[in-house]
């Protein structure tokens, strides 16, 4: 859902967005992203479940270039840090993307569930070992009780938090402002 919310934000800013459903391992991941693409009104590139995720990423970038899209957002599997082959897939996806856009990806956003506590730390650790994570989005921060995860992970891995998810609505993905976030602990 984070990707759908990002697509909505970028589209509101006037950008042409293409989504890529490269999480071909998780049941219903492709369908979920298609629902978001329809809701937001952006195109989506997908293949059947079990397809090669790198192939989906490649097709997504080829389509984005052909459509003169400003932004391609590719959803990948691997949220479960213990799936080593999924982590290796990220390296392959990057390599294949660079065949279309030599300096791709321009950003690697790791989406973490803020309600998972220590598991989020382990997930961040595994992802930073597998790929160059440039920023974080931390979801399920509807209350400040889970806020320590944001600060701890960003500090430990020296990765800036770019977005926080504070609800299920399409506008509930917010740009992270550290001073506002800290103030929310005291107000």
Label each region the model flagged.
Residues 1-187:
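P-loop/Walker A NTP-binding module and the surrounding RecA-like catalytic core of P-loop NTPases
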């Amino acid at each position: 859902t984070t990707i759908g919310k990002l697509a909505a934000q970028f589209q509101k800013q006037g950008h042409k967005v293409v989504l890529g459903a490269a999480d071909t391992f998780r049941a219903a991941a492709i369908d979920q992203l298609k629902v978001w693409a329809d809701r937001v009104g952006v195109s989506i590139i997908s293949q059947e479940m079990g397809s090669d995720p790198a192939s989906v990423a490649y097709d997504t970038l080829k389509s984005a270039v052909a459509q003169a899209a400003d932004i391609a957002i590719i959803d990948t599997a691997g949220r479960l840090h213990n799936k080593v082959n999924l982590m290796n897939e990220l390296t392959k996806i990057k390599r294949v993307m660079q065949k279309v856009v030599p300096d791709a990806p321009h950003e690697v956003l790791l989406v973490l569930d803020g309600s998972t506590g220590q598991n989020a730390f382990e997930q961040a650790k595994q992802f930073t070992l597998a790929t160059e994570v440039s920023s974080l989005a931390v979801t399920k921060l509807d209350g400040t009780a889970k806020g320590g995860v944001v600060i701890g992970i960003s500090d430990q891995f020296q990765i800036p938090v770019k977005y926080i998810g504070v609800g299920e609505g399409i506008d509930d993905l917010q740009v992270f402002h550290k001073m506002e976030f800290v103030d929310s602990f005291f107000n």
